């Protein structure tokens, strides 16, 4: 609200917009032309309209029931169990990429910056849920941060994949803008969370400082395209852009990175403004499309960004949720990057991006369906 109607009442708006009421009265009473009289009526009722438009939207958020809370807690415990059981000294306290149980049982002993960041967040979430104490949080977080500090980097950025048994980068050294951004923004959240528990274990304050040091050392200038005001997809092992393609859509997993880079002053605000906002409509909703139409692109950034109610991003998320619900099979919905029914020579599931065609710019083959 503006200062002119700061008490929020109609009387307050009338008191501070007397000139509008007076001018509207004169125009309505004495103007010879109907158009002027109509303008006078609008001016007369302007304070009332301004008050109604400035009033807060009623919050329709529902409080979770006890049953829902227990269900969420059970899901959280099962998710944390993956990290708890698979992260150890054998993996240098880094999480494996995935665990496959059939048709061949195997563990993918590789990891990425996003995987590492989510593991660190899972430790913090486990403390929030009460699954572990602050001492265990400090011990395990310290072990992982210690390993991260030893990993080979380029200008403070982690490479895209590491062998967690040898800690060496895998394949041709490559630095992904979105993976690097995910990791750094997750560390920002982790540091804030560790501060909340630092009174219970002094080591947590030191670990929060270590997280901020890693964030501070990460150079995102290598991804910046000054002509397009966007981020390159990634860079080679020497920090040079690979190709000319940039992340150019707001409904993308890069949204978190772009928001933080602009908010922290690392890169110009033009970055946020340059992201495409291509609009479409479906099932009574209007919203922005993404490249692949996946849940990951729309909803993953919302783990970290506050969603402003009734904003265009909020409407686009509702649009995406509606599209995902309509793209269901046997009541199950939610399509994103995942494994699918195809195998490599070692009988490992292949992995690629999947999405809802009506939410995507990408074209999908007919009959392809994954949930």
Language model regions located:
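Ser/Thr/Asn(+Pro)-rich, low-complexity disordered segments
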Residues: 2-49, 54-371
């Amino acid at each position: 609200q503006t200062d002119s109607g700061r008490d929020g009442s109609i009387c307050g708006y009338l008191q501070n917009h007397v000139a509008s009421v007076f001018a509207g009265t004169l125009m309505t009473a004495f103007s010879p032309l109907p158009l002027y009289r109509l303008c006078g009526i609008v001016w007369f009722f302007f304070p009332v309209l301004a008050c109604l438009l400035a009033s807060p939207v009623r919050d329709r958020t529902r409080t979770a029931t006890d049953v829902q809370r227990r269900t969420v807690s059970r899901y959280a415990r099962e998710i944390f169990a993956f990290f708890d059981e698979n992260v150890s000294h054998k993996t240098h306290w880094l999480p494996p990429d995935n665990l496959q149980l059939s048709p061949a049982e195997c563990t993918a002993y590789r990891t990425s910056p996003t995987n590492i960041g989510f593991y660190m967040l899972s430790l913090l979430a486990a403390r929030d849920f009460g699954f572990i104490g602050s001492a265990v949080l400090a011990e395990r977080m310290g072990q992982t941060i210690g390993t991260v500090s030893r990993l080979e980097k380029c200008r403070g950025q982690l490479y895209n994949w590491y062998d967690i048994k040898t800690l060496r980068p895998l394949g041709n050294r490559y630095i992904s803008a979105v993976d690097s951004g995910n990791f750094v923004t997750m560390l920002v959240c982790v540091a804030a969370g560790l501060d909340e528990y630092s009174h219970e274990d002094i080591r947590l304050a030191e670990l929060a400082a270590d997280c901020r040091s890693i964030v501070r050392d990460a150079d995102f200038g290598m991804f910046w395209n000054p002509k397009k005001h966007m981020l390159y997809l990634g860079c080679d092992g020497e920090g040079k852009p690979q190709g000319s393609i940039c992340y150019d859509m707001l409904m993308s997993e890069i949204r978190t990175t772009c928001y933080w880079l602009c908010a922290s002053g690392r890169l110009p605000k033009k970055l946020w403004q340059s992201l495409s906002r291509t609009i479409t409509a479906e099932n009574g909703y209007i919203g922005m499309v993404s490249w692949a139409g996946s849940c990951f692109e729309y909803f993953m950034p919302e783990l970290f960004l506050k969603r402003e109610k009734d904003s265009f991003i909020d409407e686009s998320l509702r649009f995406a949720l509606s599209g995902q619900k309509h793209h269901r099979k046997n009541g199950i919905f939610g399509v994103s990057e995942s494994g699918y029914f195809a195998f490599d020579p070692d009988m490992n599931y292949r992995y690629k991006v999947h999405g809802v065609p009506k939410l995507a710019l990408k074209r999908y083959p007919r009959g392809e369906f994954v949930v």
